Amino acid sequence: MPQTSDGNVHAPQYREAKPSQGDPSLSVSQLFRLDNRTIIITGATGFLGSTLAIAILESGADVVCLDLPPTPTAENWNDVKTTASRHEQQLSYYQLDVTDEDAVADTFAKFLPTLRYPVRGLVTCAGLSLNGPSSEFPASAFRKVLDINVTGTFLVAKATARAMISANTTGSMVFVASMSGYGANKGVDTAGYNSSKAAVHQLTRSLAAEWGSRVGLPLIRVNSLSPGYIRTAATAEALQKPGMEDQWTGDNMLYRLSRVDEFRAPVLFMLGDGSSFMTGADLRVDGGHCSW
């Protein structure tokens, strides 16, 4: 990476306007296409990660799935494999602890030589939420949430950026944040989670500033997605609390919880070339929760 002598990395001499990733000749139907590229997904075996993997495969990209289990569970993985086969896309899975810097580097070294197409995208779905009263919450648990949600996002983004820089290819990253990065959740004590997602918002802006116009580097756009409450197995326990579902549904303008499939189009938009003038932004898909 080019170094500055005056310490101001955003001085004009270190910035340049990159060619747009967008193509005005593309038809509207092509704006969500991800052909001839590889997209990396962390937390890929979860409900959101596996749903997005299917959507990305259907949009023409090869997919590298990363997650903590040694092997993906059949429940979600069979549909992902079937989609890859049907669309003749390359699909691979690697076990990875996103908080382990050496493991991240080693895993990237394993899969990069096997790819058909250059890495041009990243979606970070790996995350953790733990709840409990802050006056009793262990520091170790607080650190774990921050380590996975913030450090893990950074480490994989760093490795992805290095792959793009090495190949001199442009790309787009989508960090899964949360509307919880804007305010405290009602009904549950999740100070660590809320803090971590606010940090992801700031990480998004910071990396977008670094990789948007730096001389000598390819253009890498960085945006985040902030979902509202999603009805999944991960939220099932919280929803069992008396009055919780009424609380959560009543706090947004659509008066319901979201489904994982409702985040496919927003992520495809941010990954694709149709969002070529979007970087450093957070796309809040929360049913109007934070606007009320």
Curated annotation (Swiss-Prot):
PROSITE patterns: ADH_SHORT (PS00061). The keyword Oxidoreductase applies. Its EC number is 1.1.1.-. InterPro entries: NAD(P)-bd_dom_sf, Sc_DH/Rdtase_CS, SDR_fam. Residues 1-25 are annotated as: Disordered. It is an enzyme of class 1 (oxidoreductase). Keywords: NADP, Oxidoreductase. Notoamides have been shown to exhibit antitumoral activities. Notoamides A-C show moderate cytotoxicity against HeLa and L1210 cells with IC(50) values in the range of 22-52 mg/ml, but the IC(50) value of notoamide D is greater than 100 mg/ml. Moreover, notoamide C induces G2/M-cell cycle arrest at a concentration of 6.3 mg/ml. The keyword Transcription does not apply. NADP(+) binds at residues 48, 97, 158, 193, 197, 230, 232. The active site is at residues 193, 197. GO terms for biological process: secondary metabolite biosynthetic process. GO terms for molecular function: oxidoreductase activity, acting on NAD(P)H, oxygen as acceptor; oxidoreductase activity, acting on the CH-OH group of donors, NAD or NADP as acceptor. Signal peptide: none annotated. Belongs to the short-chain dehydrogenases/reductases (SDR) family. Short chain dehydrogenases/reductase; part of the gene cluster that mediates the biosynthesis of notoamide, a fungal indole alkaloid that belongs to a family of natural products containing a characteristic bicyclo[2.2.2]diazaoctane core. The first step of notoamide biosynthesis involves coupling of L-proline and L-tryptophan by the bimodular NRPS notE', to produce cyclo-L-tryptophan-L-proline called brevianamide F. This is Short chain dehydrogenases/reductase notP'.
